[in-house]
Structures are given as C-alpha cells and as structure tokens.
Design a protein with these regions (language model features):
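C-terminal catalytic histidine-bearing segment of alpha/beta-hydrolase fold enzymes
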Residues: 293-334
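Serine-hydrolase catalytic machinery in alpha/beta-hydrolase-like enzymes
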Residues: 4, 27, 34-37, 41, ...
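Conserved loop-alpha-helix segment in the C-terminal half of the alpha/beta-hydrolase fold
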Residues: 280-291
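N-terminal secretory signal peptides
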Residues: 1-37, 46, 56, 60
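Primarily recognizes the serine-hydrolase "nucleophile elbow" in alpha/beta-hydrolase
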Residues: 203-262
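Acidic catalytic loop of the alpha/beta-hydrolase fold
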Residues: 272-277
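Short, proline-enriched alpha-helix->beta-strand connector loops that line the catalytic pocket
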Residues: 260-265, 290-293
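Short beta-strand/loop motif that positions the catalytic acidic residue
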Residues: 267-269
C-alpha cells in the first residue's frame, strides 16, 4: 500500500480496521476531525486504549498524540436523533447538494423499512422502488462506515427513480440499528461484526429481493461506498447470483479470490485517493488475468468520498459522471 503524506503503512491490523483507521487519520491530519474524535473512533475499532495507542502510532501519530494505555475506554454517548433504519422524514435530505438528490415522498416512488431473516435474526433495510407491480431490476446498496444514513437512503431513491428496486441494508440491525449507536462507535461496531457477516446479510437480502413480485428474478446488482465499496468487492467474490457490481473507492478484495468473481464489476476510483487508488493496478492486473468482465475507472481531480454530496469532498461533475457510468454499467449487464 502506498504512503500518503509520509504516513507509515499499517501492517498489523485487519483489512477493514486498517482501512478505517487510515481514513480517520487522514481526516485528522487534514483538520477535518478532532484528536478527541479520532481517538474515540480508533478505540472503538481496536477495543482497548492500548491497542488504540499502538494503531495510532502505526499510522503516524507522534507520542504526544496517542492516548496512554491506562486511559479509560470511551463511553458510548446516548444516541441522538440521527436517522437510521426508521422511515425517512418527508422532504429534502439534510445537507444534500447533488442535483440528483431525490427527496423522501417524491412522486412515483414507494419507500418503506423492510425486514428479512439472516442468521437467525431480522435485518432491517430501507427499500425504495417505483410505483406499480411490473417486475424490474433491483440493486443492493451498502452504506459507508457511518451506517445507514439519510444520504444512503437518498441514493436508494435515486436508483428507484431510474427504475430499480433499491434495498439499502442497515448492517448494524443486530446492534439495534445505526440510529441507536454513538456515531463514533459505528465504525467499530461494523468492523467487530466482520465482513463475512455483512456479506451473509447481503446474500439474505438478495434472496429477499429475488422473491418479490416487483423484481425481475435474477436481475440484481450491488453497489457500495467507501467501507461499503469494500464489502461490495468481497460480495462480488461470493454472491454468484449478482449480475453486476459498482464499488466506489473501497478496499480491494483478496487478489487470490478475484478468479471467483461472477458479476460484471465496475470500480470507481478518485485520482487523489492514494490510499485506495494506489494499489488499484494490482487489482486490474488480477482481473485482466481472468475472464471477469470489468472496468476500473479513475476520476480526475477528486479525493476519497467525492460522491457523497453531504460531505466536504463532494464534486458535482465527477460524482455525476460516476453515477451515470454506474447506471450505464448496470443497463449493460443487469
């Protein structure tokens, strides 16, 4: 993995733990996250202050920036009114800047919170689909490390406006749902659950959608953003029924699993996102050595998370281009 701004490469964490801690370190160094928040999030990911101190040192923090191993673990704060698995409030999405944004209650769409079984429990998801009963294609949507947010619900509605039944899972359903958790504890809860559990939940979601009369059986795609992009890549190696995937700047799958990919895979990368785009040629080479239908595209002049129009890195031109490219990919293969 390439270095960014002189930061050492982390080598002693799991893939998704490493991915998130490095992302938060970059936000902290750029002034977009306080040291207090950075420390809390790393502690929730690693499970102890000693491990948090070690991880923060590995990513490049100085000794006076890391907590003492004997410091108490942060206490999760009571959840605020952050929306999660509940039905979204009608109207515009808070902070949305994209002209593609679709408000809750938009004409011609049906939205609801649905539940389906996975691993002996019920998983919640936000479903958005066109009105009517004519069967059409569907797409599974995997959220970022923030959990199921109004932005991701908006993305689901954008797909619904394009004719898809879009199901955005709350991968923290077993923990009570995104809305029930301290926002700093959400990334740690996601990594502690493990990518395999998340992929299994998407398999259950696939089966749920495939059984609905408004879905044209078998015509199901998947997309994900940041952390969700990594889950989408892993799902592509395991969920053989998927027709296509579009992973937005997520960590790559294990290269030895690339030959098992069945769907047509599209990768969205940001030119300035060294951490994810830097290793991308290795993934491209692995894909080139197979019969997997694929395209990995780098969007110029933008950084990680450029598609999220509620964030500071949003770029309207490139986000719109990546969205249109994803739709074109799905039209071709789904």
């Amino acid at each position: 993995m390439p270095q960014k701004s002189g930061r050492p490469v982390v080598t002693q964490l799991g893939k998704f733990e490493q991915y998130l801690i490095e992302e938060f370190f970059d936000d902290y160094r750029a002034g977009g996250m306080s040291r207090h928040t950075f420390t809390r999030r790393v502690a929730f990911i690693t499970g102890s202050m000693a491990a948090a101190a070690a991880a923060m040192t590995l990513v490049g923090c100085s000794p006076n920036e890391v907590p003492r191993a004997t410091d108490p673990m942060p206490t999760p704060s009571p959840a605020t009114s952050s929306p999660g698995t509940g039905t979204a409030s009608a109207g515009a999405v808070p902070g949305a800047k994209s002209p593609l944004s679709v408000p809750e209650g938009a004409a011609g769409l049906l939205t609801a919170t649905v539940k389906f079984p996975s691993g002996g429990t019920d998983i919640s998801g936000y479903l958005a689909r066109p009105e009517g009963v004519k069967p059409g294609p569907a797409v599974l949507v995997c959220h970022e490390n923030r959990g199921l947010t109004p932005h991701i619900q908006d993305v689901a509605r954008r797909f619904a406006k394009e004719g898809y039944a879009a199901l955005a899972l709350d991968l923290l359903s077993r923990e009570g749902g995104t809305a029930s958790l301290d926002r700093d504890a959400v990334p740690g809860a996601l990594t502690q659950a493990g990518a395999q559990r998340h992929v299994a939940d998407f398999k259950a979601a696939y089966d749920y959608l495939n059984a609905q009369d408004y879905v044209d059986a078998g015509r199901i795609a998947m997309t994900g953003y940041c952390f969700g992009g990594g889950i989408t890549w892993q799902a592509a190696t395991e969920l053989t029924g998927l027709k296509a995937t579009s992973a937005f700047y997520g960590p790559a799958p294990d290269l030895d699993k690339v030959p098992t990919i069945k769907p047509a895979v599209f990768g969205v990368y940001a030119e300035l996102d060294d951490r994810i785009t830097g290793p991308m040629p290795e993934l491209r080479a692995a894909l080139d050595a197979t019969d997997v239908r694929h395209e990995l595209k780098v969007y110029p002049g933008v950084d990680h998370a450029f598609h999220n129009d509620t964030g500071e890195r949003y770029n309207e031109a490139q986000a719109t281009a990546a969205w249109n490219d994803t739709l074109a990919w799905f039209r071709k293969y789904v």
